[in-house]
């Protein structure tokens, strides 16, 4: 197992101009990360293609492998022309991942695009053929580079373990795997302690995070649909409220989850993905320390 961070952990500092992406790379290396994952937030590779090479070279100089590149996407746009444009956009990011020297990349299927009222089993089944078609096309494109694509339980619509597994089975491509986010199952009111174990046979990457879980009535005037920014309360499909926490300090049983991961023999990459309200550098450092301690003891 290799433990590292997603650049998402330090996005508040990137946003506020306190760090550059090269500072993030150095921070990860200085904190003994064994890999780094990139997300294209405050990191516009498409507008600045030479940045791809600079980032790859900086990671090489820091002896910090790049594990993956993770992208929000919506392959279910209602208009055919828009769907084709979105698939082409994801393909350009697969090109980026290849230029970074990667063998895998995560893309979403339907990130944060549907109100709760349309997030139904009926609509999921109705749109299922489009999902399969889009994921297959992107997987086949990635295969031309020898790359694997991964789907994450993310974005509310393709979020529960059964939905993700059903899609993976229907796509039926050897180079399509899963990024398991241990916390995101809570967005659809599924406990990660149960869902992670079910999804482990499909895993090619794990995002490690924690959440506080509260009843909505206790949090008047906060949160909203898809208001998932660092430190914000946001609503689940079932009406509970979540907020990002420092690993091990929230309401997920991280000990059980990491124990299940370790005892299943998972030997891939794990990324810390901190999205709480605490200062991001100190919080991410605590998350790394906590993950290492738990992994050693479970």
Where would I find each of the regions flagged by the language model?
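Active-site acidic/histidine proton-transfer and metal-coordination neighborhood
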Residues: 26, 57-61, 65, 77-178, ...
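Conserved, mostly hydrophobic/aromatic
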Residues: 5, 28, 36, 59, ...
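Acidic-and-aromatic substrate-binding clefts and catalytic sites of carbohydrate-active enzymes
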Residues: 12-18, 39-51, 74-84, 113-117, ...
